[in-house]
Amino acid sequence: MINKITKPKLLIGYYLLLFSLIRCLPEKESSYKDLFTSLLFLPNQTNSNQVNSVSINNDPANPNPVNPASANNNQVNAVPENDDPANLNPVNPASANSNQVNAAPENGSPADPNPANLASANNNQVNAVPANNYFTKEDSSNNIPKKVNSKNVEIKVLSHNVFMLPTNLPRWGNLGHDERAKRISKSDYVKNQDVIVFEEAFDTSARKILLDNLREEYPYQTDVVGRTKKNWDASLGNFRSYSLVNGGVVILSKWPIEEKIQYIFNDSGCGADWFANKGFVYVKINKEGKKFHVIGTHAQSQDQNCSNLGIPNRANQFDDIRNFIYSKNIPKDETVLIVGDLNVIKESNEYYDMISRLNVNEPRYVGVPFTWDAKTNEIAAYYYENEEPVYLDYIFVSKSHAQPPVWQNLAYDPVSKQTWTVSGYTSDEFSDHYPIYGFVYADPSTPTKSGHKKKYDQVSFQSAANGKYIQADPNRKNGWLKADAVIETDFTKFNLLQEGNLNPSCIKNGLVRIESSRFLNYFWNWWLGGGSGNYGYYSKFNDASNQLEIINLSDECLENGSKIVFKDYDTYSRNHYYLTVWDKGNWNEHLYLWKDSISQREIFYLKLNSTPVRNWSADLIYR
């Protein structure tokens, strides 16, 4: 899909103008395409390296801030007094100015973020679907599937939406496409498969890295659907040469591909999807003499600018797939698989309609409960932090053809062993979607537990002074951090990230980024914008204090119960100070960058997350 729920807003007016020009003057199609592409992409070049050009205000509330300074700035234009948050005039080692710049903000929370509306700007127009007279529905009397003997050759399939959008899409930019492609191709989760189907492999550079690096294990590869009519045994459906975006689907195989066909959906879709040549890739694979037929696809996204979130369009596209299968007259003793990001929520009404239209069996579902989850996946949360998790990706077996004794779909949530960074954004996620596996029987290479939980994820910090836990503001994602939680909750959990650490299971000392586990992409930072909140810590979107250190007082790997302190750098006074739990007035129990020595109020106990990792080994079926 180009998006989940809504996707990047392309310049609709320009596209429609292009479409009109092409329709009116077909002989000028190439010239108009080149001209329009230049006009479209030129304004975005200055932002092509940005993760997201949407400005989000995440600083704490201040009625009339004067030149607020970030904790990460090297210069402070207007330096407010670092005075006592409770106006009690403590000795302030960080203060060098007796004049207060701004009145103290209300003792509340930082301001609510106000991101630009990400709703699609595309219109609701849906192209008319041409009648498909090429296909005829097969005789249902000949629809009796044949069982595959369990001793016969089996197939293992991986599907993953890799979220590699065209890099010049407004506001989306390049979220580490090349770096993620390198990490995906070197990761364990793509190994030991027979077939891989990638969706959203739109970007040319990242796709080349991905395919080239995997070519040794998967030497048989198709072109990406919708790019060209060449390199296929046949190109069917509604191929639109004026589309500016390919369809993003590509298939890799360990075994010879005997036939490959691209089919562009007759229903061109709606919203942002209309501008892509979306469809499906069909391949016939010969594994040790056994033929397998695989269809890889990426159905219409759930775009808010589509009628009923694209349900009618997806229904038409699923009909295209089924009709194509009927037209191929595939022998009944050969397996047919339908694979991809189908953009249908599992167990919804549409889901059961899809099962019927595609004429497939429901698989046995195991693994993590969702394939797209903004509660656990940082990339998904980066763009859609308020969306509920959903299951969208599937590997189905056609009912009309050979049936395995069992068919399992395993949703898995791997992360990269090493982080990647682009334009200041750092993550260890491979994509906004999680991959899924389709297989008959599990084997020793089958993942049996979540790959997402790391040792220093969801840790808590208990104050040695008051026995309470530091927590993010339960009511505001960018609220103040306070050591006031009596028990551990979702809001007292934080993820520790130490970039460049080759052994992420052992953090001793050094620079860290501390992220709220409850509010992904919100990091510890301190406020310097005037008022009593100066040097108070809060959760800031995609902006961690870049000089925050964790110090283990025992100088060993951090373990449960380790005694620690935090140190950070004051960009104004150019000195380091320890974080402390404030103990007076209205700002009691707030976290501050304040002390130049260590006492009980600067000491915390690290609590590792004791929740067992999600394990589904008992749900798997082995031979």
Curated annotation (Swiss-Prot):
Region Disordered: list its residue ranges: 51-121
Molecular functions per Gene Ontology = phospholipase activity; sphingomyelin phosphodiesterase activity
Where does this protein have compositionally biased stretches of type Low complexity?
A: 51-61, 67-80, 110-121
Q: Which UniProt keywords apply?
A: Hydrolase, Secreted, Signal
Record EC number: 3.1.4.12
Coiled-coil ranges from the UniProt annotation = none
Q: GO cellular-component terms in the record?
A: extracellular region
- InterPro entries cross-referenced by the UniProt entry: Endo/exonu/phosph_ase_sf (IPR036691), Endo/exonuclease/phosphatase (IPR005135), Sph/SMPD2-like (IPR038772), Sphingomyelinase/PLipase_C (IPR017766)
Q: What is this protein called?
A: Sphingomyelinase C 2
Q: Which organism is it from?
A: Leptospira interrogans serogroup Icterohaemorrhagiae serovar Lai (strain 56601)
